[in-house]
Amino acid sequence: MIQLDKLNHCYTHQGNASHNESLSMSFDLIAKKGDIIALIGPSGAGKSSLLAMIAGFLKPDSGELHLNGELITTQAPANRPLSMLFQEHNLFPHLTVFENIGLGIHPGLKLSRQEKEDIVVAAARVGVNKYLDRLPEQLSGGQKQRVALARCLIRQRPLLLLDEPFSALDPALRKEMLELVKHIAREQKTTVLMITHSPDDALKISNKCAFIHNGKIRVFGPTQQVLGEPKDEVLIQYLGF
């Protein structure tokens, strides 16, 4: 379970010569083990900043973050029990698919026989086991994201953060990747927080949905209820109803 308790951060952006623009963010959220939560909202609302605070890339000004009962607010990003997948796959171009996945286990690729076998299994689960000897430049965009997903999964962390990793893929492939994440998350009982600008994608994969507006979670609940029967006026306007 992940719990955000008044996780706050004030972001100041230098605007024109007359003033600076600021956004005061404050997040409260409880996600149970195995929840897949879609984070929706307008650009600049604070969705990516929320994931950055959870991942440790952005230091909160105050508040607490617990994962499975452990306080991780001050932990270094590398020590946090989570994985994160971005729109950019971040594969190393000079390493093979096998090696890129292996980085999820050991940054120096010092792997045991069992760990090497685990890499093959992870590659098979996401459908790239035929390409283990290839370099990223020899893969399609969808295949690269599958490799990046395998690298996340092999770490076997209880929390997976997705920052629109499939938004650049064509609709059919994006749907396939979302179903893959949903299947694996259920199988491993992984908690997933996923940023998306597509209500349809949220409905396909998530059981809960958080609408973020002006740095706060304005609406939170079951996805079908939040998106199918919206009652909040700001959310209704965002959805275009």
Curated annotation (Swiss-Prot):
Positions with a binding annotation for ATP: 41-48
Main location class: membrane
Its membrane topology: Peripheral membrane protein
Cited Gene3D superfamilies: P-loop containing nucleotide triphosphate hydrolases (3.40.50.300)
EC number: 7.6.2.15
Enzyme class: translocase
Catalysed transformations (reactions): thiamine(out) + ATP + H2O = thiamine(in) + ADP + phosphate + H(+)
Cellular compartments annotated: Cell inner membrane
Signal peptide: none
Gene Ontology cellular-component annotations: plasma membrane
UniProt KW keywords: ATP-binding, Cell inner membrane, Cell membrane, Membrane, Nucleotide-binding, Translocase, Transport
Pfam families reported in the protein's UniProt record: ABC_tran (PF00005)
Domain ABC transporter stretches: 2-239
GO MF entries: ABC-type thiamine transporter activity; ATP binding; ATP hydrolysis activity
The protein's assembly and partners: The complex is composed of two ATP-binding proteins (ThiQ), two transmembrane proteins (ThiP) and a solute-binding protein (ThiB).
Similarity section: Belongs to the ABC transporter superfamily. Thiamine importer (TC 3.A.1.19.1) family.
General function of this protein: Part of the ABC transporter complex ThiBPQ involved in thiamine import. Responsible for energy coupling to the transport system.
NCBIfam families with a match to the protein in the record: thiQ (TIGR01277)
This protein's name: Thiamine import ATP-binding protein ThiQ
Organism annotation: Photobacterium profundum (strain SS9)
Lineage, highest ranks first: Bacteria, Pseudomonadati, Pseudomonadota, Gammaproteobacteria, Vibrionales
Gene, per the UniProt record: thiQ
